[in-house]
Amino acid sequence: MPIGGVQSWTATVGRELQRLGHEVAFWGPERPLPAGRFDAGVVANVPHTRAALARCGRVLVVSHGIIPDEGPAGERVAYTSEGVRDRWKGAGPILRQPIDLAFWTQTDAPRRFLTRFSYRRGLDFLPALAKRMGLQFRHVADLPPLDARAALRESAVVLATGRAALEAMACGAPVVICDNRKYQGPLLDPDTLGAMARNYSGRGGVVPTPANVAEAVQRAMGAGSLRSHVEAHHDARAVTQQILEAMAC
């Protein structure tokens, strides 16, 4: 499963809906549409998923980003952050990124790594920065969830954005919001908790350099674990209930 993104969101919410007793069909535009009709549908990326809308009695569109594919459509729309909603000048509810806190957990494993948790490249100064700070460098780019979780549990600090940043927080790792994103280039958001309003994307931040990333890493390690932040704002159980309420189910 890719790091972060719609697939992880869908799997997390779908499992929670199943736990609550709902029958759930998972679908993506690369697959044939399931037969029959559905009481409700939760969809994103409407330019690619529009064919499914007519199969659903009611639809909630979740707008999760700033590019055209991720925009709002239809009558029931929710947004994953204030920044996303402002980008589209929308008025729907905010549904925070849902994280499975029963899976993404912390342990007492030694934390020896400065970890970059992203499928993206760039930020080539990070291995040298980790060495100067007495840490080993690890780039987690394509590990399955169990292996990614093990790596996060061994991380003294994690550089990530979006859902990946939240999964790292849930594993007890200090987090720096930093990545090299396709549409905005390299970004560092020094306000980790304030980044919630910006979907932890790095937007509105500064260009990362060895000096300001080192400062952000030291500050994050001083602040420590942010699991309590994820528990307060991103628990998949609470977010799924909010989804049902937004759909009037």
List the predicted regions and their residue ranges.
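Short amphipathic alpha-helix
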Residues: 6-17, 243
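Acidic anion/phosphate-binding donor-loop and adjacent secondary structure
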Residues: 69-72, 86-112
